[in-house]
Amino acid sequence: SNAIVGRVAPTPEEDPSFAMYDARHSAIYWRPSTVANATGGQIVDPRSGQILKGEVNMYHNIMELQKNWYFIQVGPLDERAQSLPMPDSLMGRLVEYVVTHEIGHSIGFPHNMKASAMYPADSVRSASFLERMGGSHTATLMDYSRFNYVAQPEDNIPLEYLIPQVGPYDHFGVRWGYSPIPEADTPDDELEILNGWAREQDRYPWLRFTTADAAGSDPEALTEAVGDADAVKSTTYGMRNLERVMNMMLQVTEKPGQSYDELENLYGQAVSQWGRYMGHVTAIVG
C-alpha cells in the first residue's frame, strides 16, 4: 500500500534540476485544451517491459464532460448537481475519479468493460451491497461505467457511492501485476501460481474480465453501462432517472437574461444518453 505518492512539482527555485518530462519522474499534466478527455500511458523499457514513467494527461474540458455525465446520469440523486455550476467539492471528486482511472492505465491496466456486468442490477441499488464491495457499482475503475444511474431516489445511496471507486478487480490486478512470487526462479515457474489466481474468477465473478479484442462479441462487455448483467432492467432504471432529469432541466439551466446554451447542451446530452441506453438493450440481440 501507499506505493504511489503524489506531490506538487518543485519550482525551479526549489529544484533547478527537476524537469517534468524527465523519464525518471511520473507525472500528471494539466493541459489547457478544449479537448474533453483524459489519457494515461507510460514509457516502457523495451528490454524488460518495465514501466519507467507513468503519464496522465488531463485536458481542461474533461470537467465539462464530467459535469454533463453526472447531471444527466445521477442529477436527480444529488442536490449538488441541481445547481450550475456544480460546487468545487463535487467537481474535484469527479476529476479525482478520472485521474485514478488514468493512473490505472499508467501502471499497465487495460480496460475491462465486463466488470460492470458482474454485479446484479438490483444489487447496485443496495447501499449495503455497495459498501461490501468497496463502495463502487462496478468491480473496477478500468471499466467505462460512469455514474450509478441504476440507483433510484428512494434507495438513499450515499453520494460517494454514485461515483466509481477502486474495486476488487483492481486489487486483483495489482496482485497479478506486482506481487512477487519468490518461489519461482523463472517466468515459466510462475505459471502454475498465476493460473491458480486466474481460476479465482470461477468463485468470484467480479474478477472476470474481457479485452479490447473481444469488443462486440460479448453483450456483457458494454461501455457506458451500469448493472448490465440485466441490461433491460438497468436501462429501465436509467430511463426513470433520465425522465427526472428532463423534468428539472429547464429550472436548473434557466437564468434570466442569459442564453439557453446550457439548456441546449444538456438536452443534447440527454438525447445521447437515451441512445446509449437503447444500445445496451439492442446489444443483447446483436
Please provide the spans of the model-predicted regions:
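Residue-level preference for alpha-helix termini and adjacent loops
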Residues: 43, 112, 140-141
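N-terminal pre-domains immediately preceding structured catalytic cores
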Residues: 80-88, 115, 122, 126
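Alpha-helix termini
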Residues: 62, 66, 114-117, 121
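Conserved catalytic/binding loops enriched for acidic/polar residues
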Residues: 116-286
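Catalytic Zn2+-binding segment of zinc metalloproteases
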Residues: 103-119
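Metzincin-family zinc-dependent endopeptidase catalytic domain
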Residues: 1-106, 133-136, 147-150
